[in-house]
Design a protein with these regions (language model features):
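Glycine- and acidic-residue-biased ligand/ion/polar-headgroup-sensing regions
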Residues: 43-54, 59
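A cytosolic small-molecule/anion-sensing beta-strand core signal
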Residues: 50-51, 66-67, 85
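Conserved short histidine dyad/triad with adjacent acidic residue
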Residues: 9, 26-40
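Short acidic-glycine-tyrosine-enriched beta hairpin
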Residues: 60-75
Length: 114
């Protein structure tokens, strides 16, 4: 099943890649210069940079990430994102993002295509 692209903040969209009983993966595409404000969630998260460059700000400290880099975020750790270049990310969450799966189900057409 092809899941829809869903904008999560200006210049940042995500699409469910795959999920199971205990894990969830999404692809996120971030336009150059886009920002995701500080937030936290009860899920553990691994951010893997497929392409591009971004800053991941964790507890006020910026971590420069580029193609091939990965970063682990524990549960409830505040973090924010600032992109330097257009960036494509594979995010893995545990437990699954039930909120994102519900949003996938309620997304209305048209569905953005690659």
């Amino acid at each position: 099943m092809q899941h829809p692209w869903i904008e999560i903040c200006p210049g940042i969209r995500r699409r469910t890649h795959t999920h199971g009983r205990t894990m969830y993966q999404q692809i996120a595409e971030l336009e150059a210069g886009s920002k995701m404000p500080a937030h936290s969630h009860p899920h553990e998260q691994i951010v893997h940079i497929l392409s591009g460059r971004m800053k991941l700000i964790v507890d006020g400290r910026a971590h420069d990430l580029k193609t091939g880099d990965s970063f682990y975020l524990g549960s409830n750790v505040p973090h924010a994102v600032e992109t330097i270049d257009a960036t494509r990310v594979l995010d893995t969450f545990s437990p699954p993002r039930e909120d994102y799966l519900a949003a996938d189900q309620s997304a209305s057409p048209p569905v953005l295509q690659d």
